Amino acid sequence: MLSPLIRRYTWNSTWLYYIRIFIALCGTTALPWWLGDVKLTIPLTLGMVAAALTDLDDRLAGRLRNLIITLICFFIASASVELLFPWPWLFALGLTLSTSGFILLGGLGQRYATIAFGALLIAIYTMLGTSLYDHWYQQPLLLLAGAVWYNLLTLTGHLLFPLRPLQDNLARSYEQLAHYLELKSRLFDPDIEDESQAPLYDLALANGQLMATLNQTKVSLLTRLRGDRGQRGTRRTLHYYFVAQDIHERASSSHIQYQTLRDYFRHSDVMFRFQRLMSMQAQACTQLARCILLRTPYQHDPRFERVFTHIDAALERMRASGASLELLNTLGFLLTNLRAIDAQLATIESEQAQAMPRNESENQLADDSLHGFSDIWLRLSRNFTPESALFRHAVRMSLVLCIGYALIQITGMRHGYWILLTSLFVCQPNYNATRHRLALRIIGTLVGVAIGLPILWFVPSLEGQLVLLVITGVLFFAFRNVQYAHATMFITLLVLLCFNLLGEGFEVALPRVGDTLIGCAIAWAAVSFIWPDWRFRNLPRVLQRATDANCRYLDAILEQYHQGRDNRLAYRIARRDAHNRDAELASVVSNMSSEPDVTAETREAAFRLLCLNHTFTSYISALGAHREKLSNPDVLGLLDDAVCYVDDALHHQPEDEQRVHQALEGLKQRVQSLETRPDSKEPLVVQQIGLLIALLPEIGRLQRQISPPISTLITQP
């Protein structure tokens, strides 16, 4: 009993992270106390906080490279503030250029975006403490010392648990997969009637979250594969990742319109049986995620075999009672798909399953990292236009920080640089995220000040305040990604305690509230009036990218029905791109729900388009999940023509409407009249073609409703 408990907490990354933060804060507070110079606590702690906020997962060589880049950026940002601080005009110019430059650097990838944010944070932390030291280099070096201290702890943790972040990402992937399967199971609820589109909307949003987690896992895998491709631990996680991708394709598959199933089988238990089976598979994915975290073997639930047996019996009973043969065949395809998911889960721990595929292409991952200066320039140049969200964010942040700095210079506020700090954290690249953070930041600050003042009064001792500083710092990082208001409250307490070490705790408390309100107001004005997102939303272009990706996915599947099934890199890229574009569309439509200047008609059309696109992708996924080489030339010919028709129907000009309609009618007749072998995958292929082309007229109508002509889209930058 003791061993599992110890394992649970020893291998719990969250607790290990909290311990690392605790040790780091103990170091930044205990050393100054031991030296008798508590003023050192402020730059050391702030440097450590900035380093923790920019912590990046990578292999050892990558972490060392990230550390060097981070320290260089931190020193440049901090030293620039110290050197330019006496000259306001030069300082404002430097603030503008550095802010826009650092943010645009994020166009090179998430690593550089994170480091750039940390550099801006260090710059503002330096502004808060410019009066602490006489020489310009003292505070920058102390801030760097705090950053180095935290990174030393991080490197130590990496040496002890090198694969831990990768396993965390992999476990989160299976948790998100479980969530997706659970939501998918709700589509089999026979009591859904009027709100039949709501579960599809939730499913599309969940798919976006799952794809984001899978993409993050892929990045973690790539960093490890560059250095230790042959190691068993990395090979094992790579196998788990490929299984997650395959389960996702099967889980996202749709074999019929769910409303048709619900209407026909409303008073039968078969819908509940399928719902329970998918719910059990969701629980199995959750259990697998837990096993990955605890590094214990996954044991597949033996009850699955009984569940499959009972579903087979239920389908046979319905077949004997004269139920629709077409619908029963569809349920049979669905059951085959769910059996394949079960087989993946049941054999995931098998040594044979974890062996490398013979085809090297099936073991490769798409590498999206930088490749040479031409690639660097290409990625940067893409963001030199207002069409880029990153460019708009860079311009907004530059103006926000300059306005805040100008306000400080005009009013002479002593601690006014908290305005800049608030704006940096609150002002996000899009309107919805900024609005959400704005309210939480204000609430957290008000509560933090209300709690902080009595604490400063009742805990006057230096040692007591240092202990509280450590506690509030740990709690800030604990709540940072789950409860932003709580995190703001604790960071407010930390700041009050830091300045109280200089005897200024009571003096800065109320100004902190005012600065927060001003910083939030500036951030809100920026996202509302400086190139607001809804003017650049361009739903037609996002939809165009989604339909293009679906067409490429269909092409990749078509190739495998001709040549045979495999998991080559090109196929997996096409599949991932289709789901990523579906996730992008879900994000845009979700943001539209709370943006101003969106008519109810546009919002409803966008919502319906999202549901249709996700359904369309799920029909394609079903073709992909069941892909195998076919020999019937009539079925292959129909599939070839259907793929060409889908591409044509989604990209045609208005004057071609009649031709496209005639082609649709011709395909429908071929689908209805084609003879197929019932003991093969041919009926499923024909069925999925029918489902795909049935959606195209409504998709086309909604496309025309929200889109300019195709020629306009092509000429736009």
Name each region found by the language model.
Residues M1-I19, C26, A30, W34, ...:
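Long, hydrophobic alpha-helical segments that serve as membrane-spanning/inserting helices
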Residues M1-L120, Y125-F161, G332-F490, C498-L517, ...:
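Alpha-helical transmembrane segments and their membrane-interface boundaries
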Residues L95-T99, F242-R250, F616:
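Elongated alpha-helical scaffolds
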